[in-house]
Amino acid sequence: QGFSSSGEEETIRLVNRTMETGIRFENDKPYTVKDVLANTAADKKSIDVLPGDILLKVNGETVDITKDRNSYFSKPSLDRELQLVFNRNGKIVTVNIHPQRTIAPNLYDEWIKNNQATVDAKTNKKVAYHNMKDMGLGELEKFFIDMTQDLYQKDGLILDLRYNTGGNVHD
């Protein structure tokens, strides 16, 4: 008869994780730095990455420009540190970055900042913009602080609840 199983222990999990640096690259030049996203692993005074830098190596491996750039940043586990080598107008620049698991919150914050700038530009700063990420007490307190410091001086208010994850403000 023997032993057989079709349980959870038989499942093989193949998972890759993306090591996010916060460095964004040009769409048409996938190894050329477009910018560095605010408050990410690469957005540190000690990390010297600038728009226009061209990625040459990741952890000592010379990049192949015909290969998908993301393959250099995806592994079964996160590296503790990534060493990136760039060409900056003929000068070699080497940086070490501690990658992060995700940049989703940073992208969300940038989206809010861009919305704020759009509202300011289109209304000549006469309409306030406030985004509440959720309905928790922390976000409610931020709203109250904004109301008392700045928003009350405006002619109108846009309270943006898009992508709000919910919560219990009423408690």
What residue spans do the PLM features occupy?
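Catalytic cores of secreted or luminal carbohydrate-active enzymes
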Residues: 1-3
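Cleft-lining beta-strand/loop regions that shape enzyme active-site pockets
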Residues: 6-8, 12, 35, 41, ...
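PDZ/PDZ-like domain segments forming the peptide/carboxylate-binding groove
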Residues: 15-65, 137
